[in-house]
Amino acid sequence: MDVAESPELEPHSPDEEQPALSDDDILRESGSEQDLDGAGERASDLEEEENATRVQSQEEIHSDEEDQASEPKSQDQDSEAHELSRGPAGSPCEEGDDAEEDGTSDLRDEASSVTRELDEHELDYDEEVPEEPAPAAQEEEAEKAGAEEEEEKGEGAPGEEGKPDVQSVGEKEPTEAAKEKKKEDDDGEIDDGEIDDDDLEEGEVKDPSDRKVRPRPTCRFFMKGNCTWGMNCRFIHPGVNDKGNYSLITKAEPFPPNGAPPLGPHPLMPANPWGGPVVDEILPPPPPEPPTESAWERGLRHAKEVLKKATIRKEQEPDFEEKRFTVTIGEDDREFDKENEVFRDWNSRVPRDVRDTTLEPYADPYYDYEIERFWRGGQYENFRVQYTEAEPYHNYRDRERERERENRQRERERDRERDRERERRQRERERERERERDKERQRRKEEWERERAKRDEKDRQHRDRDRDKDRDKDKEKPKPRSPQPPSRQAEPPKKETASVGPQVKRADEWKDPWRRSKSPKKKLGVSVSPSRARRRRKTSASSASASNSSRSSSRSSSYSGSGSSRSRSRSSSYSSYSSRSSRRSSFSGSRSRSRSFSSSPSPSPTPSPHRPPVRTKGEPAPPPGKAGEKSIKKPAPPPAPPQATKTTAPAPEPAKPGDLREARRKERQTRTPPRRRTLSGSGSGSGSSYSGSSSRSRSLSVSSVSSVSSATSSSSSVHSVDSDDMYADLASPVSSASSRSPTPAQTKKERGKSKKEDGVREEKRKRDPSAQPPKSSKAPAGGKASQQAAAPQQAAPGQPQQGSFVAHKEIKLTLLNKAAEKGSRKRYEPSDKDRQSPPAKKANLSPDRGSRDRKSGGRMGSPKPERQRGQNAKAPAAPADRKRPLSPQSKSSSKVTSVPGKATDTATAGTKSGKASTLSRREELLKQLKAVEDAIARKRAKIPGKV
């Protein structure tokens, strides 16, 4: 019983080897087990001989086992060696074989029990323990070979144990009867013999259990139909005496029905779930009631182990897949199975399922589930219920069906996922294509805009010059600047008066919805100072909402040129207001939008500039709360009401109509905000970020927010939004749509960049007011558009309102935004016309841009020099401070920005115009940021330019 063999052989040798054994092996097994059991049986009769022969037999066994260990293949030889050893000993050898078998069985039993109970039995067999099943199997095979050869020669051959010397191999055959008799006697005595194997007293219990543990090989002769021993045959007659020493529930009957006895232990075993034997084990041992104690001990032990294993299986079954192999009747169980083919059958049965399930990993969940029920039924209930083989198979079929269903479902899911991925990829490709198209369109637009801008600038310059000539009063300050000042001054007047007359020209320019491009070119065409001055103001406004103003520029283009110039200056103030409101809105968050609406409405009354300052005060307070546009978005709504309240309160100052509008807008927005919130992540977020787009420069989020929001809106609408934006751009003659669309796409791209670049862009805008003014000039291109844009900006300085323009973009926002925009436009236009504060704001904006615009601010200020003075005085300092801080602050956080805004606003609060200037500065910075961002975004993405 060399240790080396057993561990490997244990799992297989008793159960698998025997089943796998060739007929000769089976014969040997049957012989060996008959010899083994016979030996056990004979042991009682032949204990004396066993004692005498046991020394020899054990020596032989050990030698045989060693040989077997060295050469499992030599098992046949070993069996022959046993036979030879028996042969030389004659019948004594046979008896010795029996003794050996008893000893070996004892050794095996002990070894098996040792394997199970190494603690209890740690003897010579401990070494053999790991091997014991295998050596047992091998020895059994060897002895079986000998015994079965004996049986083949004569099943009774060993029967003549009394004639140790006389019995020859040939004699063994005649002694089958004696053997059978002894077996019959020994059937009861097997346990006795096992118990009698007191030499291995350790294993008395072991011996019975171990022998029983060793599945008896199926009787080859019975399989052939030859076995004369009948029920007494030591070897398993599959249907008949399978039950082991203790007959199972109904000894032969359950098994034969389950599997034909010839089918062998496995079919039979499945028939009797091993649990069944437990019942019988506990029940009086089979007819050969060996000392009931031993049988009972076996039964109890067996039952305990079964229970343990059942509980283990229960515990492990969730993991059953992993532990299945250990859980399924393991080697230990097999040893039990050796006794109870039932166990073996379970092994065969469960392993089949196990194998199948292993092949079908997806079936596992079901399989484990099934197996769990299966085990409970078989193992736990088997104490009471005996499964017929059919049930497991039904379960198995069900399991297979479930597995198939599961597999199908998983395949379907996989297919769906693949389809989704494909769709995503397609969408992405389409988006990319659209972006490319948009870029191309943008390029075309920009080209057209440049051309138109050049034309418009020329026309505007001429017009502005004419207007300036006509408006010498306005031109007086601008005149020193000559073209530019006139244009700037003209712009304020234009805002007032030219808006009507030049609107026609703007209408012409309107044809150039890409007036933005013109405005950029106008930016380029600094020579076109007039438009440039406007543009700068607008730039603050438009740059605040570069995309808005760009959109508005196209819109404003639709407005008459002079009107556009006016609207530009207005739009700057609006933008300032809208930026303020948008800032507030950004601060307030999605509601801020409503605020931006309301604030823009209240700004729409002339006092609105003051109101924005008031709001600015209020706003700065809310903004900190709203500190981050994004963070504010949620909290913002509450602050929004305060601001709304402030707005409302200020609104009365400017005009209750504004308040009414505000109320309407608020209502719309209030209605909408839910919608926005519905869009909420994108909607309110984008709303605030859009309004935040003005705030973009303001808050870190600023561009990032606007880009986020625009990205959100575009991403939230995702493809649809993108297409909406793109088409919205197309849809809204206002390129603002396109700029909007660009903004989302650009914003998306710019999000990461925007945060970093916000400050940079602000700086760039400050540095490149000319560059921004072009965009802002685009915004100026549509002064009214910019006003509208301003309203949109307020609504969603960023895309949202633009989206509203493009009703497609954010429909939720759109409805509110459009209504708000319309209201705001109307409000703004009148209030804008009324307001010259916009110039002051523009002056403020210009201060924001830098002192560069201060000149224009001064000129622009001419309409409202007071504001410009206050604003410029404060604004230049504050803007200068803010410009740098704002860009950093915008980088650092909208809160900080808003706080400086508050401080500045508070400082400027003394002068509402100062506040307006600070707000306008902020807005200008924001607008500039926006314009720069938009420009950068357009250049980078060139997506938005959808013509």
Swiss-Prot record:
Keyword Lipid metabolism among record annotations: no
Region of interest (Disordered), ranges: 1-218, 275-295, 387-921
Alphabetical GO biological process terms: RNA destabilization
Zinc finger (C3H1-type): 214-240
GO MF, one example: protein-macromolecule adaptor activity
Subcellular location, principal: nucleus
Residues joined by cross-link Glycyl lysine isopeptide (Lys-Gly) (interchain with G-Cter in SUMO2): K505, K617, K656, K812, K902
SMART domains for the chain: ZnF_C3H1
PANTHER family given in the database record: ZINC FINGER CCCH DOMAIN-CONTAINING PROTEIN 18
Subunit structure: Interacts with ZFC3H1 in a RNase-insensitive manner.
Name of the protein in its database record: Zinc finger CCCH domain-containing protein 18
Protein species of origin: Rattus norvegicus
Lineage of the organism: Eukaryota, Metazoa, Chordata, Craniata, Vertebrata
Gene encoding the protein: Zc3h18
